[in-house]
Amino acid sequence: VSLVLAIESPDQAEVTALLDCSDAYMAELYPPEGNFAVDLHALMQHDISFVVARLDGRAAGCGAIKWLTDGTAELKRIFVADDARGRGIGGRIMDFLEKLAKDRNVKHLFLETGPLNTEAVLMYRTRGFSQCGPFADYEDNPYSLFMTRDMTAGATSPEPVKQRVAS
C-alpha cells in the first residue's frame, strides 16, 4: 500500500468527487449559511496550492493552502474519504501543507472549521492550533471555529502516528 502526496489540479473527476463528498458531509452538519467551502474555480486560482493524497493511485484525501498577505496563509478543504480514514492520511496532508507554509516563511497559519467537526478540531489542536477570532473576510458566526498556529514559536509537528495500513 502506497501513499503519495503531490500538488495537483483540483479539476479532475476523481478529485471533484472527493470535494463533493466533503460538501455532502458538511451539508449534514451545518445549514447552508454555515458552509464556507470554496468552490472548484476558487481552488484553481494562483493564490492557492492544492494537494491530493493518493492511496495506491486513488485520490483518498485532499487539502489546500491559500496564500494570504504579510506572512499568513489559510488551510482549506482538508478532507479524507470515508473508506481511507484511520490511516493517518489527514496528518500527512497537514504535514505537507505545513511544509509548504514553512518553505514560504509563513509566520501564522489560519483555518476555519466547524465546531461539530470533532475529529478535525482534535487533529488541529494536537498539531498546535488554538482558537482565535475571525480572520480575512470571515465574520463571527455560530457555525465557525477559527483557529491559528504560530509557525515561528519553534512549534514543530508532532511525531508521526504509526499508520495502520490495511493489506
Model-identified regions with their sequence ranges:
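Charged, amphipathic alpha-helical coiled-coil/dimerization segments
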Residues: 87, 99, 108-110, 121
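Acetyl-CoA-dependent GNAT
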Residues: 3-76, 81-83, 94-96, 100, ...
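Conserved catalytic-core motifs of GNAT/GCN5-like acyltransferases
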Residues: 10, 110-113, 121, 125-126, ...
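Loop/helix-junction capping segments adjacent to catalytic residues or to phosphate/diphosphate-binding pockets
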Residues: 13, 87, 118, 141
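Short glycine-rich hinge loops at helix-strand junctions in the catalytic core
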Residues: 88, 105, 128
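A generic structural signal for beta-strand entry/edge sites
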Residues: 70-72, 108, 144
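Active-site acidic-Proline motif in GNAT/NAT acetyltransferases
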Residues: 81-83, 87, 115
